[in-house]
Regions:
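...the same signal can extend to comparable exposed beta-sheet modules
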Residues: 1-201
Length: 201
């Protein structure tokens, strides 16, 4: 719920969802802001009466007074759910209730892979010729946006509005490469092209 206060001026930004509820009986309007945060599944507990996952928050969660943001931990990072839907290290989107002080929803985030063409600090990036705006709660696995380099490969994760909420470096896949140990052309006395490779496995 949002009150008319200067402290709330920056609550709504790219990536926020605003819902308005009108009470006809009292002529009251309630405005709710739903922020989406990003995290990773650090563990899951299946052998209890109410199975749950533990979310490691990558983006900071806004506190009740809206003046500070913190990382959630302990029981606040738990979310009761069907743990079959998640694996450890999954990147997820979650919402958090300030009033209840708990996670309210968790879903797996959609991702896009590609080469970084360019980026504008604090605003957007272009990956594989497509521009994506930043969510207000964007986070980077490598610490800082300024650590990104163009022509390098990244995996970006999108919030429910299609904005970038998490950026990760694309893992090097050694199986896609081979070391050329020996080559032979058809002009040799053996009369055919040959190459000897050493694979990573």
């Amino acid at each position: 719920k949002v009150s008319s206060s200067s402290a709330n001026n920056k609550l709504v930004a790219d990536g926020s969802t605003v819902e308005v509820f009108y009470d006809e009986d009292n002529n009251d309007v309630t405005i709710c802001i739903i922020d989406t945060y990003v995290g990773t599944i650090s563990s899951k507990e299946e052998k209890v009466s109410d199975p749950y996952v533990v979310v490691n928050s990558e983006s900071l969660v806004t506190e009740k007074d809206a003046s500070t943001s913190v990382s959630i931990s302990g029981s606040k990072a738990r979310f009761e759910t069907n743990t079959d839907n998640f694996e450890e290290d999954d990147v997820v989107l979650f919402t958090y209730s300030q009033s209840a002080d708990e996670i309210k929803s968790v879903v797996k985030a959609e991702s896009v892979e590609g080469t970084l063409d360019k980026y504008t600090l604090g605003k957007n990036l272009t990956l594989a010729d497509t521009e994506y705006k930043y969510s207000k709660n964007i986070a980077f696995s490598f610490g800082s946006e300024t650590s990104m380099t163009t022509k390098s490969d990244y995996v970006i994760y999108l919030d429910t509005n299609g904005m970038v909420i998490y950026v990760d470096e694309q893992e090097f896949d050694a199986s896609q490469y081979a070391y050329v140990l020996y080559t032979q052309s058809s002009n040799s006395r053996f009369g055919k092209d040959q190459v000897q490779l050493v694979m990573s496995d």
